[in-house]
From Swiss-Prot:
Keywords: Ribonucleoprotein, Ribosomal protein, RNA-binding, rRNA-binding
Provenance organism: Desulforudis audaxviator (strain MP104C)
Record-linked PANTHER family: 50S/60S RIBOSOMAL PROTEIN L14/L23, LARGE RIBOSOMAL SUBUNIT PROTEIN UL14M
Full protein name: Large ribosomal subunit protein uL14
Gene Ontology molecular function terms on file: large ribosomal subunit rRNA binding; structural constituent of ribosome
Gene3D superfamilies documented for this protein: Ribosomal protein L14 (2.40.150.20)
GO CC annotations on file: cytosolic large ribosomal subunit
UniProt-listed GO biological process terms: translation
Keyword Cytoplasm found: no
Functional summary from the UniProt entry: Binds to 23S rRNA. Forms part of two intersubunit bridges in the 70S ribosome.
Lipoprotein found in the keyword field: no
UniProt subunit comment: Part of the 50S ribosomal subunit. Forms a cluster with proteins L3 and L19. In the 70S ribosome, L14 and L19 interact and together make contacts with the 16S rRNA in bridges B5 and B8.
Length: 122
């Protein structure tokens, strides 16, 4: 459950380290984002020499959340952190590597490039 003002870790090599959610894309009164949802973020912390600089406004997809999400088979999955991957307008990642596991729900939401780059899909 990501809402406005939530700070997320970045799970790719774009140079951004921390993102703060400033908008959840979807309907106009949407309050929470979960795994696979696209959010608009401001970069709050960045590594020198990266593609994304501090203060940049970027789109990102949520790949890990602390709040558990239910699956159709009755199981639940949750992670130790909130994390996102910076994406372009065509839903492809801006970085070339993904760090850490991602959820299987990204496959159903057509983020196949992120799923293929991830070291583990849970």
């Amino acid at each position: 459950m990501i809402q406005v003002q939530t700070v997320l870790n970045v799970a790719d090599n774009t140079g951004a380290k921390k993102l703060m959610c400033i908008r959840i894309l979807g309907s106009s009164f949407r309050r929470y984002a979960s795994i696979g949802d696209i959010i608009v973020c401001s970069c709050k912390e960045a590594a020198p020499g990266g593609v994304v600089k501090k203060g940049d406004v970027v789109k990102a997809v949520v790949v890990r959340t602390k709040k558990e999400i239910g699956r159709p088979d009755g199981s639940y999955i949750k992670f130790d952190e909130n994390a996102a991957v910076v994406i372009k307008d065509d839903k492809s990642p801006r970085g070339t590597r993904i760090f850490g596991p991602v959820a299987r729900e990204l496959r159903e939401k057509d983020f196949m490039k992120i799923v293929s780059l991830a070291p583990e899909v849970l």
